[in-house]
Amino acid sequence: MSSLPDDLLLSIFARISRLYYPTLSLVSKSFRSLLASPDLYKARSLLGHTESCLYVCFHFDSGPNTHWFTLCRKPDGTLTNDTSKKKKSNGYVLATVPIPHSPPANFSSLVAVGSDIYNIGGSIYLGPSSSSVSILDSQSHMWREAPSLRVELMSHSASVLDRKIYVAGSYKDGNGDSNSCKNLFEVFDTKTQVWHPEPIPCSKTKGIFYSKSACIDGKFHVETTHGVVYAYKEGRWDKAIPTMFGMRASYSFCEINNVLFYIHRGVFRWYDTKLRMWRILKGLLGLPSLPENMFVRLADYGGKMAVLWEEDRPSCGAGGRDEMMIWCAVIALKRHLNFSFWGKVEWFDHVLTVPKQHVFVKALTASL
């Protein structure tokens, strides 16, 4: 197959699910080059083969850089026995994405728009605050710089609405004491690659912007002491619904098709904006018991829910390393006529093993 003309190979690759690309890239350097070619993704788009690709970001104690992985099919294509769960593997794995010098990041700084993953302001935990903005091209897996924020933020969060990135954060002004914190709200247009020329006023908002936000019903919801929401069409700030933020004590939440989902103590819930209350996600037969929500991450996976969680790896003896197993499940979501949500577990698998000393930064999806 490697002796075929490049044009023919591109045509073949464009018709193959991207889940198999990490394996194909191992065949040869020419394959790796073709799989990163812009022409390949143009062909995929013309064929209507654009798909959602799951990316997962970790930080290990071995250095300041983040490490990236993407969901794919196992290279050998076989189903292996997994005795820890008394089941056979479904053939999925998180493959390493070779990205050199990947900048620090945290949950609230990472968002995806199309095939680009944006790192807004870096990580406030792994180094000094930053105003830098970096973009990871998930086609070539190369970072490039974007226009920076106006100031370095102490805490911040970013969410996407209509291909624009809404960033809310706080920064120290003046002498830098605790009473000098101010809020900042900016909007980045991903089409023009420029920030809104005049930052949107947020002086009337009460409380400092925290590091959690979500875009629901065309509005940018930001967690503060009381919670606020920005209605961009009206250009004003309003007080948020208290119950929407009351359930999100951690980062185990995501927005899927304009619905906010959350897991707390092993129970999945979704937010009903009409009733202004959290409701239980029904179904989920076959899903194993999950750990505390601080060890769980959720992501929109093409309208389905990707659930990733950590679990202690069985001891390998006195000389064994302390490691954690990363599991992944994909759940199809369906809304019934009575407005209840049901989840159907399509598969779950042990997809990665990582050092015990790590930070599970985030899982998110790019469209390719």
UniProtKB/Swiss-Prot annotation:
Signal peptide: none annotated. The lineage of its organism: Eukaryota, Viridiplantae, Streptophyta, Embryophyta, Tracheophyta. The keyword Repeat applies. The keyword Plastid does not apply. Keywords: Kelch repeat, Repeat. Pfam families: F-box, Kelch_FKB95. It comes from Arabidopsis thaliana. This is F-box/kelch-repeat protein At5g51250. Kelch repeats lie at residues 116-163, 165-218, 260-304. Residues 1-44 form the F-box domain.
